[in-house]
Amino acid sequence: MEEKIAFKNLHSREYQGHKKKVHSVAWNCTGTKLASGSVDQTARVWHIEPHGHAKDIELKGHTDSVDQLCWDPKHADLIATASGDKTVRLWDARSGKCSQQAELSGENINITYKPDGTHVAVGNRDDELTILDVRKFKPIHRRKFSYEVNEIAWNMTGDMFFLTTGNGTVEVLAYPLLRPVDTLMAHTAGCYCIAIDPTGRYFAVGSADSLVSLWDISEMLCVRTFTKLEWPVRTISFNYTGDYIASASEDLFIDISNVHTGRTVHQIPCRAAMNSVEWNPKYNLLAYAGDDKNKYSADEGVFRIFGFESS
């Protein structure tokens, strides 16, 4: 089967702005802005133009690493950041100003919006989940788990909530009650990351066993696995049509596979372990960031975007 996209003809561009390594990259809902969160305690918002030029604005205020960030799914200029300083902040990407702040109980490492934009879920290093009401920016639900909780996600309709765990399971909870519905024995080692396919048919899970599994959301059954990586899978993302999945780890490449066949269609070479990959919601542009160092062994503070027709 011929692939629809000639990946081999596409190029990556590099964006420099942070003083230390970038932990997280995320696109806004219109695909026009990309945010990057860094160990340098800042986030930056980049206005990416179709030919790849960018203007950026700095979001300053956190006093520890910005570990993950996510955009309001209904508002192209509102972004939430999670930091090791125990706060979660809401920002206006036009002004660069922090509009809301919530002080939570631990070092925050995971954050995700409910698809309707009303709630934000935050996970911390102590395996505690906090749900914030976005309007008041106050916690409406807190739950501590007795096992390691990694990346978290809602399904497209917002009535199911997924937790990836250190036990190799995916816990499926009914939302908003957070009532356990299912435990999926997904992998032989810890599950680190999860992505929901934009068509709503599938979700994918990346694991320490180096595999990515693809699950049918209505049946809760594993459809196939992607086996190209050899190291623990740190980050995964579906493209906007749901036809391709990108996955990355400490392997020195990002794998892009066809979701329907399971076959690799392209590999993007990397110079370091990757922390975050995310496809643009409107175009086949893949942002990625990792532990890149310069020749003096200092963090480069860069991210890249793959998918441009010229370098």
Specify the residue positions occupied by each region the protein language model found.
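Loop/turn segments within WD40 beta-propeller blades
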Residues: 25-31, 70-76, 112-117, 153-159, ...
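WD40/WD-repeat beta-propeller blade N-cap
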Residues: 15-22, 59-66, 102-108, 143-149, ...
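A short beta-strand motif characteristic of beta-propeller blades
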Residues: 12-14, 55-58, 97-101, 138-143, ...
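WD40-repeat beta-propellers
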Residues: 43-48, 88-92, 129-133, 170-174, ...
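Blade-level signature of beta-propeller repeat domains, shared across WD40, Kelch, NHL, RCC1
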Residues: 275-311
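A short helix->beta-strand "capping" segment at the edge of beta-propeller domains
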Residues: 2-19
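Conserved strand-to-loop turn within each blade of WD40 beta-propeller repeats
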Residues: 37-40, 81-85, 123-126, 164-167, ...
